């Protein structure tokens, strides 16, 4: 379980997050949404251990987070892939740094690529891939170390609408298959409502938790209902419009 208690953090010398209290249980998909500048990415960077926080605590499985660790896998919008390495070697890179034997890490990379639908693309280079394929590689790399927690920072923001829909459904299938804790940062309201088992709305900066909404649309999808059916459901549309109104309230307050 991820547990965040009374978290305060600065960014660029200014308060970015204020008294954040959150929990994320195993098998849950928590989505954090809010207006630009609300501290969404700062929150992810704190959980990843990339930056320090000023007050409070972040614990994963009862252990305080004070730096990066293999128990947390991170996927970024810009993927962060190595262009001079092929797809398989990119996925296996973290395992190589961890000292995993070559044949074992290549087999793990092969299995992860199979999970994300890129079996057969092992020897291709990053520049030969589409945006959606590069994000699949990024997800495969994050899963390769078998982390307890998967962190994703607006991973589908630069993709076209069709590819974004494909990646959303892929992530939900991987979430169901692996049972991992997942925390997703997004600025896309429809994506947030569709994918969250719990949606956290942050205020304008410094970010505070405005509201926590338990949702069941992601579970309906993994139970077999189509994404198109879910997104055209009046319940989904009503929730999307409610969340949109809450985000607009914060944008207007900030301006």
Curated annotation (Swiss-Prot):
The record's SMART domains line, in alphabetical order, gives: AAA
Question: Can you quote a single GO CC term?
Answer: membrane
SUPFAM superfamilies cross-referenced by the UniProt entry: P-loop containing nucleoside triphosphate hydrolases
Residues that bind ATP: 34-41
Tell me which InterPro entries the record gives. AAA+_ATPase, ABC_transporter-like_ATP-bd, ABC_transporter-like_CS, ABC_transporter_ATP-bind, P-loop_NTPase
- EC class name: translocase
Mode of membrane association? Peripheral membrane protein
Q: Which reaction does it catalyse?
A: taurine(out) + ATP + H2O = taurine(in) + ADP + phosphate + H(+)
Where does this one sit in the cell? Cell inner membrane
Keyword set includes Oxidoreductase:
no
| UniProt keyword annotations, A-Z | ATP-binding, Cell inner membrane, Cell membrane, Membrane, Nucleotide-binding, Translocase, Transport
Provide the E.C. number(s) assigned to this enzyme: 7.6.2.7
Which Pfam families does the annotation name? ABC_tran
Q: Which GO terms describe its biological process?
A: cellular response to sulfur starvation; taurine transmembrane transport
Name what induces it.
Regulated by CysB in response to sulfate starvation.
Q: Which GO terms describe its molecular function?
A: ABC-type taurine transporter transporter activity; ATP binding; ATP hydrolysis activity
The ABC transporter domain is annotated at 2-229
Keyword Metal-binding recorded: no
Q: Which family would the database say this protein is a member of?
A: Belongs to the ABC transporter superfamily. Taurine importer (TC 3.A.1.17.1) family.
What function does this protein fulfil?
Part of the ABC transporter complex TauABC involved in taurine import. Responsible for energy coupling to the transport system.
Record text on subunit structure and interactions:
The complex is composed of two ATP-binding proteins (TauB), two transmembrane proteins (TauC) and a solute-binding protein (TauA).
Q: What is this protein called?
A: Taurine import ATP-binding protein TauB
- Species of origin reads Escherichia coli (strain K12)
Q: Which gene encodes it?
A: tauB
